[in-house]
């Protein structure tokens, strides 16, 4: 029991800075929305539409680079720190390489908006925002590379502190470029993109400075010796990270596609759906942070060849996640009216949002299990299992079920938004079951098998 308490304490210490950094990241999006809304509803809508294109694209890159976390954690745990600089420098090259196709996708924004038949003025502002934020892509991915290094070393506080510096810097920069202060042009919503680009380059510079000057990382000296890019290493990292990137992309696009499928049902339903999704996304940060911490702990334990310790870290992570999810689910059920009223004063929207928040409460526990089990499997480097199972859960089970229940009369009369939310519950529950079973299978393997997985 003492081991479990110690592990829970270590996980919470690692997860808390990750959570706070996520809050800072969300805060930047909130500031963008509010300040753009201060100019006009069109500017606010343009920033929202631009984010729906920008986020899936950049999250794919982040997913690829997240593969570095268990790599670094295992090298650190196995006292092979001298190999870490090579891996991080290969990660830097990979970050720059994948910036190119991501920028290529973002440059197609005009074409995407034409397909969506977006109103001309809003489309112009959306394209302007994307063209400004394109310059942030390399900085964002380079920052993620260095963050994977510090997180893998169990140093999650630097990214947290720098995330809040970025948030504090984002506010005045938005004010300057959105409203045209200190001689800057008044760019409206496009100014949010300019501010975001500056902030991410500053955040990258600050984390680079920390990595190069920190006494805790001095022995590694990650950029002390130059390591030439190696094609084999790039392919290995890409293969390791691609399943995670694809799994992230599946999940993000699932919610984005549902938002599009709900949109013809009318503004009241769309608004209520947005309220429930926004709140559940905020709550999701808790288990997501625990999942990130579990990935680090499992990777470190496997590096030490401590298979039993990796199993304990996985189990404790799921227990902590379930405890937190139970608390947030109870709060959601009891406070759903108050939560809805924080977003809107429209009684029809509040009434429907309260119903959807009940669905959100139902899937919080299974959502916690799936994201933490995925984090543990990342620690084992069992990336392909995450990819296969999330694809089946979200796109074979969740989305089709949601569409059938929400928009057709094949089984019952069309349920509208509630049908799609039942699809979420089915998809996330399926992911939790499949990933949980895979993790249990991993724990039952011989120690040599588990360690061989982690040596991929």
Curated annotation (Swiss-Prot):
User: Which Cys-Cys disulfides exist here?
Assistant: none
Mind telling me which residue stretches traverse the membrane in this protein? 11-31, 53-73, 92-112, 126-146, 159-179, 189-209, 242-262, 268-288, 314-334, 356-376, 385-405, 417-437
| A molecular function (GO) term | antiporter activity
**What is one GO biological process annotated to this record?**
sodium ion transport
Instruction: State the annotated membrane topology for this chain.
Output: Multi-pass membrane protein
Q: Which InterPro entries match?
A: MATE_fam, MATE_MdtK, MdtK-like
Q: Where in the cell is it found?
A: Cell inner membrane
* Record has 4Fe-4S as a keyword: no
Q: Name one GO cellular component term.
A: plasma membrane
Q: Which UniProt keywords apply?
A: Antibiotic resistance, Antiport, Cell inner membrane, Cell membrane, Ion transport, Membrane, Sodium, Sodium transport, Transmembrane, Transmembrane helix, Transport
NCBIfam families on file: matE (TIGR00797)
Q: What does this protein do?
A: Multidrug efflux pump that functions as a Na(+)/drug antiporter. Confers resistance to several drugs, such as norfloxacin, ciprofloxacin, ethidium, kanamycin and streptomycin.
Family from the record: Belongs to the multi antimicrobial extrusion (MATE) (TC 2.A.66.1) family.
Q: What's the name of the protein?
A: Multidrug resistance protein NorM
Q: Which organism is it from?
A: Vibrio parahaemolyticus serotype O3:K6 (strain RIMD 2210633)
User: Its gene?
Assistant: norM
